[in-house]
Amino acid sequence: MLSLINHIKGEKIAYLAPAAEGNTWYPNRFIASRASNQPKLDSALATVKGLLDKVKEAGIPPEKTVIMGFSQGACLAVESAARYPQTYGGVVALSGGLIGAEGELTGYEGSLEGTPVFLGCSDIDFHIPVERVHETRDIMSGLGAKVDERIYPGMGHTINQDEMDAVNAIISNLLKS
């Protein structure tokens, strides 16, 4: 994610980018059962929650905070927002979706009222089934988020300029408010 900083436009932005031990946040696919990804999954979510708490304690309110990630980081971004709902400045998932096996995407409560959520993914991403992106869209919308889902034909597991433009739009709107 740090390599994307040069493509994000705006001043007075602080970035917190936690690094996963061994470059992986959890051992199995994000569509595997949550139990199969323990205890790493809970540890990863606690890391994100801890950072969100520190940012808030530093005087930066959630509505000025954007949670963003790519791949496993994208999954953690949307999962964290859904588990710890409040109005955020934005949530960005570049090639990711909510974590858990089919039937486990339940129990999300609270409100993301007005939070802009961007979900960008390829229709042929070998890590991310497009159906999970759609499920994530529906759940985040159900929590009150304003979801912008974009599915890119034939892109694969990468990030494109349109996605970066969407990220910059979220940040630009946030900096204006």
What are these regions (language model features)?
Residues 1-5, 105, 129-139:
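Short alpha-helix in the alpha/beta-hydrolase fold that links the catalytic acid
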Residues 1-64:
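Serine-hydrolase catalytic machinery in alpha/beta-hydrolase-like enzymes
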Residues 27-34, 96-116:
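Flexible "cap/lid" loop of the alpha/beta hydrolase fold
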Residues 67-69, 92-94, 120:
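Short beta-strand immediately N-terminal to the catalytic nucleophile in serine-hydrolase-like folds
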Residues 68-73, 77:
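Gly/Ala-rich beta-loop-alpha elbow adjacent to hydrolase catalytic centers
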Residues 86-99:
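A conserved short beta-strand
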Residues 118-121, 125:
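Short beta-strand/loop motif that positions the catalytic acidic residue
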Residues 134-177:
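C-terminal catalytic histidine-bearing segment of alpha/beta-hydrolase fold enzymes
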